[in-house]
């Protein structure tokens, strides 16, 4: 008899119902639960799968390069980045009639194409790529790297090349190699690329495989480096009249600290970026020599953690026991990694628009909007994942004996205080913010807008002033010419920075008022409530007063039967599931705020945001409704336009989103009855009844149906907003 899917679980493979398929898919990546798994083979499988992940990433990025080189207009775009629309790839669609062909033939192409809103054109241009040939070379190189990664994954599954468990648990070696090798050396290599290729190209000096060994990145070569006169490398930077990609106004400096933006490209100075990466490289290469391995010198992580005991004893055993807890729990490590990565991804979203690193990105409004929204949503999913794996750690890996009275144990012991404080903060934020919004709505509705409660964000304005924003008239720190902070840096980076922060053409420290104050607190409500649900889920994952033995039921369970009322919806998984809805809504508010504020800035009518953002009807009417008009007009009696694809996606996104509720609101019995009726009809329908099934059809479990509902809700939500964002921005600005 052929072995049925799933091979990793004999119990499931013998299940006579369709549960076999769905549970098989659901647990395919839960290696810990598979038959015959050992700790060592678990680590080895995960390690090998990382190479597969890398292979996919390199294949994907190779595809981006290849399609732009083949079907894009990169060379034309580099000659006039502000007026040529970058093409992502061609569209071949047999459904296209003549009006569709005409609508999508743009960007100088002779056939229908998609416009690129990913920022890759700006990135490739900034780092020194100039021709289609450069793109093809990059695509081929990444294809080779992808093949190497795939081979490495296969190789590390072979018995002779499988690392041992002790190798995976050698924390010091891993820290050293990741800090020095991964971050340090790669930052150094990137500095090298910027200095040797990107900066010369930005000054009109071609550097390629043919001449990179003979072109000096600096007129004095390595002389100043070896003689210690490093300041030479910062002398003679590009002038403010420099034209990117030409020698006009170009300097010779390679490592600078100018501050602010290149006036023409509105992006950070390339020489500042190179300097930053060099500094990062030095720091991380040093950091990667700190931990004790072969030579008996340096820090031991275990010793560091064990000695972290607060002296007075009031805080218990401190970090004792944490080394083994972290080092023996993959879920703990993954939780930490996801928490860090989530924060970093959100920071990328913030910095990509406020300090644009790529030439001419700041003038491509749709791309800026797309990149901000993309990175914020991804950050949300990653951050919720951190708490999910934190909760799984508490259920599967936490050892109370090993962590007696340390910080982890103490967190669990005073969880009621933590959860109730978070709850109070969420309630306070929610009621006060909603109260202000609704009051303002009523005042607008009754025709007395002057009776709105409008609060100036004075503390935030003070912080902006401290960073040098002069508009508010606070005479403090960098906004005061006489402060030590100002005088200390006057000749170095400050002139460029002060010019940038007080210039209204960029998004650095935007002017804020009462509308910003309100939406800031609405976002704070969302963040605190999402955190409350996630933290409660993790802290109650092992047990609660209501259900002390919760950990014995695992991470995800629907209920403990009818005998124990109130045990439904309280698994750690349920907390994660609820939190994702809050996360999505919160990031909805974040992206609405960012987008509307920027639309009004870019259009020069910032008064619209300032006046309409202080009450809810303003958001609904002047942001959502007003900006969806282009979408609703994608198809009309006069034919179609290039926004029609977004109009269709907007409708389809709503459909996917609404489908989610079908799974979220109806429970298992309804589906079971429906399936049995459909199966009955199938068996009695001629022709159809020639097709039989081996597995008895049964409804999804409660937990699975929730997952399917959540997946539809999330995908539909993001898809709908993506269509709205891109259509409403590109409809205005091209």
Curated annotation (Swiss-Prot):
<keyword id="KW-0157">Chromophore</keyword>
<keyword id="KW-0460">Magnesium</keyword>
<feature type="transmembrane region" description="Helical; Name=X">
    <location>
        <begin position="643"/>
        <end position="665"/>
    </location>
</feature>
<keyword id="KW-0603">Photosystem I</keyword>
<feature type="transmembrane region" description="Helical; Name=VIII">
    <location>
        <begin position="517"/>
        <end position="535"/>
    </location>
</feature>
<feature type="transmembrane region" description="Helical; Name=I">
    <location>
        <begin position="46"/>
        <end position="69"/>
    </location>
</feature>
<feature type="binding site" description="axial binding residue">
    <location>
        <position position="654"/>
    </location>
    <ligand>
        <name>chlorophyll a B1</name>
    </ligand>
</feature>
<feature type="transmembrane region" description="Helical; Name=III">
    <location>
        <begin position="175"/>
        <end position="199"/>
    </location>
</feature>
<keyword id="KW-0560">Oxidoreductase</keyword>
<comment type="subunit">
    <text>The PsaA/B heterodimer binds the P700 chlorophyll special pair and subsequent electron acceptors. PSI consists of a core antenna complex that captures photons, and an electron transfer chain that converts photonic excitation into a charge separation. The eukaryotic PSI reaction center is composed of at least 11 subunits.</text>
</comment>
<keyword id="KW-0150">Chloroplast</keyword>
<keyword id="KW-0411">Iron-sulfur</keyword>
<keyword id="KW-0148">Chlorophyll</keyword>
<comment type="function">
    <text>PsaA and PsaB bind P700, the primary electron donor of photosystem I (PSI), as well as the electron acceptors A0, A1 and FX. PSI is a plastocyanin-ferredoxin oxidoreductase, converting photonic excitation into a charge separation, which transfers an electron from the donor P700 chlorophyll pair to the spectroscopically characterized acceptors A0, A1, FX, FA and FB in turn. Oxidized P700 is reduced on the lumenal side of the thylakoid membrane by plastocyanin.</text>
</comment>
<feature type="binding site">
    <location>
        <position position="559"/>
    </location>
    <ligand>
        <name>[4Fe-4S] cluster</name>
    </ligand>
</feature>
<keyword id="KW-0408">Iron</keyword>
<keyword id="KW-0813">Transport</keyword>
<dbReference type="GO" id="GO:0009522">
    <property type="term" value="C:photosystem I"/>
</dbReference>
<feature type="transmembrane region" description="Helical; Name=IV">
    <location>
        <begin position="273"/>
        <end position="291"/>
    </location>
</feature>
<feature type="transmembrane region" description="Helical; Name=IX">
    <location>
        <begin position="575"/>
        <end position="596"/>
    </location>
</feature>
<feature type="binding site" description="axial binding residue">
    <location>
        <position position="662"/>
    </location>
    <ligand>
        <name>chlorophyll a B3</name>
    </ligand>
</feature>
<dbReference type="GO" id="GO:0015979">
    <property type="term" value="P:photosynthesis"/>
</dbReference>
<keyword id="KW-0793">Thylakoid</keyword>
<keyword id="KW-0812">Transmembrane</keyword>
<feature type="binding site">
    <location>
        <position position="670"/>
    </location>
    <ligand>
        <name>chlorophyll a B3</name>
    </ligand>
</feature>
<keyword id="KW-0934">Plastid</keyword>
<comment type="similarity">
    <text>Belongs to the PsaA/PsaB family.</text>
</comment>
<dbReference type="GO" id="GO:0016168">
    <property type="term" value="F:chlorophyll binding"/>
</dbReference>
<feature type="binding site">
    <location>
        <position position="671"/>
    </location>
    <ligand>
        <name>phylloquinone</name>
    </ligand>
</feature>
<keyword id="KW-1133">Transmembrane helix</keyword>
<dbReference type="InterPro" id="IPR020586">
    <property type="entry name" value="PSI_PsaA/B_CS"/>
</dbReference>
<feature type="transmembrane region" description="Helical; Name=XI">
    <location>
        <begin position="707"/>
        <end position="727"/>
    </location>
</feature>
<keyword id="KW-0602">Photosynthesis</keyword>
<protein>
    <recommendedName>
        <fullName>Photosystem I P700 chlorophyll a apoprotein A2</fullName>
        <ecNumber>1.97.1.12</ecNumber>
    </recommendedName>
</protein>
<keyword id="KW-0004">4Fe-4S</keyword>
<feature type="binding site">
    <location>
        <position position="568"/>
    </location>
    <ligand>
        <name>[4Fe-4S] cluster</name>
    </ligand>
</feature>
<feature type="transmembrane region" description="Helical; Name=V">
    <location>
        <begin position="330"/>
        <end position="353"/>
    </location>
</feature>
<dbReference type="GO" id="GO:0009535">
    <property type="term" value="C:chloroplast thylakoid membrane"/>
</dbReference>
<dbReference type="InterPro" id="IPR036408">
    <property type="entry name" value="PSI_PsaA/B_sf"/>
</dbReference>
<dbReference type="InterPro" id="IPR006244">
    <property type="entry name" value="PSI_PsaB"/>
</dbReference>
<dbReference type="InterPro" id="IPR001280">
    <property type="entry name" value="PSI_PsaA/B"/>
</dbReference>
<dbReference type="GO" id="GO:0051539">
    <property type="term" value="F:4 iron, 4 sulfur cluster binding"/>
</dbReference>
């Amino acid at each position: 008899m052929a072995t049925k899917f799933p091979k990793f679980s004999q119990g499931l493979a013998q299940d006579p119902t369709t549960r076999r398929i769905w549970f098989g898919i659901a647990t395919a990546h839960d290696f810990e639960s598979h038959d015959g798994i050992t700790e060592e083979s678990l680590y080895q499988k995960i390690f090998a799968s990382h190479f597969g992940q890398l292979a996919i990433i390199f294949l994907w990025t190779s595809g981006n390069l290849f399609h732009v080189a083949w079907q894009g207009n990169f060379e034309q775009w580099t000659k006039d980045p502000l007026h040529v629309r970058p093409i992502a790839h061609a569209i071949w669609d047999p459904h296209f009639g003549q009006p569709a062909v005409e609508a999508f033939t743009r960007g100088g192409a002779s056939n229908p194409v998609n416009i690129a809103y990913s920022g890759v054109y700006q990135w490739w241009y900034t780092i020194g790529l100039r021709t289609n040939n450069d793109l093809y070379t990059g695509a081929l190189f990444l294809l080779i790297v992808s093949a190497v990664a795939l081979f490495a994954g296969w190789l590390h599954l072979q018995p002779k090349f499988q690392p041992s468990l002790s190798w995976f648990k050698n924390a010091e070696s891993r820290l050293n190699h990741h800090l020095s090798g991964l971050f340090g050396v790669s930052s150094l290599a990137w500095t090298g690329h910027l200095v040797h290729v990107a900066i010369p190209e930005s000054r009109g000096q071609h550097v390629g495989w043919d001449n990179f060994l003979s072109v000096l990145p600096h007129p004095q070569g390595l002389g100043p480096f070896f003689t210690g006169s490093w300041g030479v490398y910062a002398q003679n930077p590009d002038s403010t009249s420099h034209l990117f990609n030409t020698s006009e106004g170009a300097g010779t400096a390679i490592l600078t600290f100018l501050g602010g933006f290149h006036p023409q490209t509105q992006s950070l100075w390339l020489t500042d970026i190179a300097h930053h990466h060099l500094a990062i490289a030095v720091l991380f290469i040093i950091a990667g020599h700190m931990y004790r391995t072969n030579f008996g010198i340096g820090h031991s992580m275990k010793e560091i953690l064990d000695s972290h005991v607060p002296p007075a004893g009031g805080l218990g055993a401190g970090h004792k026991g944490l080394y083994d807890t972290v080092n023996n729990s993959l879920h703990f490590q993954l939780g930490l990694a996801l928490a860090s990565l989530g924060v970093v991804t959100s920071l990328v979203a913030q910095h990509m628009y406020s300090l644009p690193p790529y030439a001419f990105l700041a003038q491509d409004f749709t791309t800026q909007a797309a990149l901000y929204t993309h990175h914020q949503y991804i950050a949300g999913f990653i951050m919720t994942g951190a708490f999910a794996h934190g909760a799984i750690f508490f259920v599967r890996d936490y050892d109370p004996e090993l962590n007696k009275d340390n910080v982890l144990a103490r967190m669990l012991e005073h969880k009621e205080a933590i959860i109730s404080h978070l709850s109070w903060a969420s309630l306070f934020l929610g009621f006060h913010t909603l109260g202000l919004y609704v009051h303002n709505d009523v005042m607008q509705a009754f025709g007395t807008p002057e009776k709105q409660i409008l609060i100036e964000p004075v503390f935030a304005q003070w912080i902006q002033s401290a960073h040098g924003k002069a508009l508010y008239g606070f005479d403090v720190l960098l906004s005061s010419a006489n402060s030590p902070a100002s005088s200390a840096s006057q000749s170095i980076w400050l002139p460029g920075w002060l010019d940038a922060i007080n210039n209204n053409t960029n998004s650095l420290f935007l002017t804020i008022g009462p509308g910003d104050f309100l939406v800031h607190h609405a976002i704070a409500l969302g963040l605190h409530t999402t955190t409350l649900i996630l933290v409660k889920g993790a802290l109650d994952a092992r047990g609660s007063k209501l259900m002390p033995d919760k950990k014995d039921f695992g991470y995800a369970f629907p209920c403990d039967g009818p005998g124990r009322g109130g045990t439904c919806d309280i698994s750690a998984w349920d907390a994660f599931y609820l939190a994702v809805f809050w996360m999505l809504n919160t990031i909805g508010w974040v992206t609405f705020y960012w987008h509307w504020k920027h639309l009004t800035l870019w259009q020069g009518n910032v008064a619209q945001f300032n006046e309409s953002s202080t009450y809810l009807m303003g958001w609904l009417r002047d942001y959502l409704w007003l900006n969806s008009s282009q979408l609703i007009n994608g198809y009309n009696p006069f034919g179609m336009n290039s926004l029609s694809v977004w109009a269709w996606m907007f409708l389809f996104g709503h459909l996917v989103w609404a489908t989610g509720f079908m799974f979220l609101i109806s429970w298992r019995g309804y589906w079971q009855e429906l399936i049995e009726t459909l199966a009955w009809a199938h068996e009695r329908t001629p022709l159809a009844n020639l097709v039989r099934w081996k597995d008895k059809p049964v409804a999804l479990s409660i937990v699975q149906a929730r997952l399917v509902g959540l997946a539809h809700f999330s995908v539909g939500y993001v898809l709908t907003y993506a269509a709205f964002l891109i259509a409403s921005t590109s409809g205005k600005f091209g």
